[in-house]
Amino acid sequence: MKLINEFLEYLKVIKHYSEKTIISYEFDICELYNYFKSKKIDIINITRKDTEAYLEFLYSLNIDKNTISRKLSSIRSFYNYLVKEEKVSYNYFNLISNPKHKISLPNYLKDEDLDKMFEVPDLTTPLGQRNRLILELLYATGIRVSELVNIKINTINQYNRTIKVLGKGEKERIVVYGHMCENIMNMYIKDGRCQLLKNKNNDYLLLNKNGNNLSTRMIRNILDDIMIKSGIRKHVHHHMLRHTFATDMLNNGADIISVKELLGHENVNTTSIYTHVTNEQIKKVYESCHPRAKE
C-alpha cells in the first residue's frame, strides 16, 4: 500500500490532478491490489498471464466497457510510475488492449431548447440575473462547471470580453464570451451581485443568497430546476451546455484546433467527437452542393 500512497501523492503534488480524479485512481488501484492480494501475488511481481487474468476478472464484474477502459488507464499510469521509480522492470498492462466499444455521440441542445431555458430566469431579481449568467457563460464559453464556480471578478476582462479560467491539472487558459453574455454579465455585476454580496468581502463571481460562492453541486441543482421549469423533456446534464457550445462552434465553421483550445482539451482526439453533424445539416449541404439536388 505504500507504493499506492506514493503514487497518489505524485498525482496530487506533481501532476496536479483534482481530488475527484485522484479518488478514482485510488479506487481502481486498490481494487487491483485487493484482487492480487486474494491470489497471494505481490503487485510488483505480476506477469503477463496475471494481467490477462485480471482483465478477465474485470469482465466478470459485468461493468460497461468504458469503465473497464478507465480502470485499465488508471492501472497503466500506476505501473508506468513504478517503472519510472524502478520498482518494476516492465509494465505488462501496456500489452493489454482496451475493450472495443461503440462511441456514443455527446448529447446537445437544439436552439429551441436553449431559448426555453434562457427564458426561465427572472432578470428582475438578483438570483434570476445570476442564473441567467450561469446559462450564458456555460453556453458562450464551453467551460466546465468546476471552472465556472472558480471564476473571480479579477479574472474577467470586461473590455476584451475574456475570462482566465483554471482547468484540469491547474492549467490556465483564456476563454471568450460574446455580446449577449456581456449584457447579462454587466447587469449581474452592477445589480444582482451587489445585492447578493451584502457588504461581504468575496471575490468570486457567482454568489448564493447569503453572499457566499456557489459549489458545483449548487450549479447542478440550479440547472436541474431551470430544466424542469423550461418544460424540456430531455434530461439536461450540466455538461450538455458544453457539448452544445462545441457542436455549434464546429457546425458554424470553427476549426477543431481552436475549439480544442477553448475547451481546454489536451488532445485533439478528445475534441473530434464533436465533429458529428446533424441530419438537417447533412441535407442542407447535399441540397446546396450536389447538382442533381437542385430544382
Q: What role is predicted for each listed range?
A:
Residues 1-295:
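Conserved catalytic core of the tyrosine transesterase superfamily
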